[in-house]
Amino acid sequence: VIGGDECNINEHRSL
């Protein structure tokens, strides 16, 4: 996927 950092932030936001 593009924007690995964004994906990480999204997961953190979910938590």
UniProtKB/Swiss-Prot annotation:
Enzyme class: hydrolase
Family per record: Belongs to the peptidase S1 family. Snake venom subfamily.
E.C. numbers: 3.4.21.-
Biological function: Snake venom serine protease that cleaves fibrinogen Aalpha chain (FGA), partially cleaves Bbeta chain (FGB) and has no activity on gamma chain. Is less potent than A1 and A2 alpha-fibrinogenases.
Subcellular localization, as worded in the UniProt entry: Secreted
Gene Ontology, cellular component aspect: extracellular space
GO molecular function list: serine-type endopeptidase activity; toxin activity
Species name: Crotalus atrox (Western diamondback rattlesnake)
Summary of the tissues where the protein is detected: Expressed by the venom gland.
Quaternary structure and interacting proteins, as annotated: Monomer.
GO terms for biological process, alphabetical: proteolysis
Keywords: Disulfide bond, Fibrinogenolytic toxin, Hemostasis impairing toxin, Hydrolase, Protease, Secreted, Serine protease, Toxin
Stated name of the protein: Alpha-fibrinogenase A3
Regulation: Inhibited by PMSF, bovine aprotinin (APR), soybean trypsin inhibitor (STI), and high temperature (85 degrees Celsius). Is not inhibited by EDTA, and beta-mercaptoethanol.
